[in-house]
Structures are given as structure tokens and as C-alpha cells.
Amino acid sequence: MHAIGPYEFTDQDVERTLASTRTLFDLLPGGFPADPDGPAAPFRAIAERALDEHGDDDPDAALGIVWGEWRSAMHALREAGAYGPRADGLVAALHLGSGGVPKHPAAEVEVTWSGVVGDRQASRQHHGRPWQALCLWSSEVIDEFAAAGHPIGPGLAGENVTVSALPWDRVVPGAQLRIGEVRCEVSSYSLPCRKNARWFTDGRFDVMHHRHGPVSRVYATVLEPGTIRVGDPAILEPDA
């Protein structure tokens, strides 16, 4: 096990995080195509150099640098105003499961550095890293898909937290949220999986890919653990 502060990485987590480094920077505001003069640019350069120089022979060292520079890039973007003003919403639903989808509703969940207590993924190949501790989705997006005829509902696609009344186009990598007692930072979009095909007409699960606009689920890193209850406030950029 590899640790960075409170975050624990398995060997597979290290490998997959390093393999995702460029994509994680691409997903940040101004990340693709990369803005050479943007707030994140100097941090990306250091992370990519560490990846090139140490990724194969000293992955622990590469991970430490990549993690630090990635988090610093998000901080720099926040300082530059990339994530906008505070917005207030609510926790509409909570979900956890023993693996796979759908997840099952809960009135309250306890969240640690590694995610929701009692929740697990059927496979960790594409899930379960510290920056994928929580999966969030918008009740308004779900409702729009349902209104279009897709048999989708909260928790069916595997999100832990369904929020309402937040501007989902601003819930992007690097944005921070206070959800109940938990503070988290959006890390990436959750790519659609064919296991979710049953929730979409003709199996067209790709419609929730972020390439189609602000419709994707998102992953988040836990910054402050705690309890979340249905009906709790969900605040985007709470310090703005």
C-alpha cells in the first residue's frame, strides 16, 4: 500500500493514476487544448516531467509529484476564478451497494477518505482510487433523461450522491463542494459503462458521456470526511 497523507493507493491505483495523469490535467478548465499561459500550465509541466523521468523506475516518487502538482493546479485555477461563485443545492438521494449497479438508497451515509462506508465496486480496474472516492450526479440531469424516455432514476447508474438545484455545468474537475459534513473536490468525469446500458433506450448509455455536455456523473476526492444525510445542503464552491 502506498500513502500520500490520508490517501491510500494500491499498486494498481498507482499504475492507473499515473496512466491517467495527462487526462486528469486535460479535464481541468483550460486543459484541452492545453493553455500554455493558463494557471495550471506550470504545474502540469512539472507533473509530466516527473511522469516521464520517474514513472517507470520510481512510480512512488512520480505519484507524489503528480498528486501534489495536480492539486496545486486546481488551487491555482480556483484563485484565478475558474470555478465561479457559490451555488446552493440539496442532497436529493444517497446510494451504496455491494458491487455493480444499481446501488441501493440510504437515508444517511458515513464518508471516509476512501469513500462511503459499506459501498464497494465490483471491479477496481477502473474504479476505487482515492480521487474516485465519491460519485456524484444531478437529479435534474436524471430527470431530463427520464423525460426523454430513458428508464433511468437516482442510484441506478451507480452514483453515491444525487444532488439537486446545482448548476451542473459548473460541477467540473477542480470544483469543490460541501455536502452535509463532507467536503470534496471534483477530480474527473465518470465514463459511461455498458453495465448501465439497461437504463437507456436501445442501450445508448453513451448519452451520459461528458462529450455531450454537462450530463455526466463526476468523481470526487474527499477533502474532509463526515456524514451526509438526505436533505442536507449541497454547496458548490462554499468559500467563494
Task: Identify the residue ranges that each predicted region occupies.
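Electropositive, beta-rich accessory/interaction domains or terminal extensions
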Residues: 2-16, 21, 26-48, 61-179, ...
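Amphipathic alpha-helical coiled-coil segments
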Residues: 53-55
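Short, basic/aromatic beta-hairpin or loop at an interaction surface
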Residues: 150-160, 201-216
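Short amphipathic alpha-helical patches
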Residues: 168-169, 210, 231
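Short, charged, solvent-exposed linker or helix-capping segments at domain edges/interfaces
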Residues: 197-198, 232
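Well-ordered alpha/beta subsegment
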Residues: 217-240
